[in-house]
Amino acid sequence: FFSSILDGIEQTANEAGYNILICQTGEDVQKEIRSVQTLIGSRVAGMLVGVSKQTAQLHHLQEVLDNSIPLVLYDRPCPSLPCDQVVSDDYMGAFNAVEYLIQTGKRKVMFMSSSFQLEVSRRRYQGWRDALMRYHIPIHDNMIVECDTRSGAIIATPRILQSEDRPEAIFCVNDDCAAG
């Protein structure tokens, strides 16, 4: 996912006469904060940031704006920040995917999610839930499994598929879960 984003960013930046600096944080919020502070100190012309899963406080990103550095967020929305944001319509994506599964005859569609602290997880959950509700399919607690890593999904999936009340389909909130 991120490599295809970087290809587009690099091509567009080069065409406009800019070079790019890449800071990978590995979903580590402390690395994210240090990287942002380093880039501010380097007086970059702008920043494109995909915030980590654990980013709850946005002070370091507000500091970017306070220094009049253009900021664009991608992937995970932060509605409280007054900057441009490029994100998917997580709600409709989930709704449409689950509706498709229902229309192909699947009625027991499990939701495998990362933490509900993430806006993306909440929106995808709402899309999943609303699709089931539209088709009058009851939602039970055992239809929701919290898991946001490939290794976690590798452990959880066999247990889910061997259960008596196993789902007919699993909607995964991210690629890591789906790969597990």
Residue ranges and their predicted role:
Residues 1-3:
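Extracytoplasmic "Venus flytrap"
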Residues 8-21, 34-43, 58, 65-180:
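Bacterial carbohydrate/catabolite-sensing allosteric modules
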Residues 22-26, 50, 74:
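A short glycine-rich beta-strand->turn/loop micro-motif centered on a GG-aromatic cluster
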Residues 26-29, 52-56, 176:
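Short beta->alpha connector loops
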Residues 47:
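Intrinsically disordered, low-complexity polar regions and short flexible loop motifs
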Residues 50-52, 115:
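Structural motif
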